[in-house]
């Protein structure tokens, strides 16, 4: 929607596994073209890319649990379809390709500020294939084709295509509807970014001069906060009556990234707080924009994949 609002002509290629009403408010927009299809179908990809001068590649089987349900399916979409997509983009005349990777490619680091030049140590196939795609994309960087990768933190807040299976959104959903949230451990750091800031990061990279971003990789996050602080921020928004329970855990892994590079080079700094993300969700709950938010499978990637016949 932001691209349309900014005057771009937009083509969306998607399977619409979460429903075909994601762009309900924009279906009749003159500058929106929707192509329902599979990324692995080269004819469909060529159709979608026709006339495009930039590609923002977001499509994948997202998160480790969903990927592990069917590793062969995950590999076919997340890795095998990637090089053909890049090549088809070049054939179609696109001159910029922005890849949504993941901050999980770093694995577990002891350093306080995990930056883009650090060695990648992905722990799962999902993360490993993200790292592989980054390297594939760099092979195609040229004066005529600007290749850029963003490694986002975990996205939070309200969106038309809503996920309620990521940490801030999970906490807010449970706090609002159950009036109780449980934190396991609590000192583990988790990087997050508000959906509006995430969109802004893509726009900044899209609009930047080629010489600024060609072949570059950028982290994009807001803050690295302990899970306990995330829960307290959610409670402060939802209500003091929310019961916050802390229990011990054997999983004390922390994830933390530095977003200094994208700030220094492109001037992008995330501005929306965790409390704002929680408030956006509360507003959506109160307006009944997210019905059956505890049970509807469309909000939970793994449940949606379990019920899908995608092969």
Regions found by a protein language model. Give the residues of each.
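NAD(P)-dependent short-chain dehydrogenase/reductase
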Residues: 135-190, 195-206, 234-236
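Conserved internal alpha-helix within the Rossmann fold of NAD(P)-dependent oxidoreductases
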Residues: 42, 82-85, 134, 202
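Conserved catalytic-core motifs of eukaryotic protein kinase domains, centered on the activation segment
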Residues: 22-24, 65-72, 108-112, 160-161
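N-terminal Rossmann/SDR dinucleotide-binding element
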Residues: 1-54
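Conserved Rossmann-fold NAD(P)-dependent oxidoreductase catalytic core, especially the SDR/UDP-sugar
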Residues: 57, 83-125
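C-terminal substrate-binding subdomain of Rossmann-fold SDR/epimerase-dehydratase oxidoreductases
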Residues: 179, 184-311
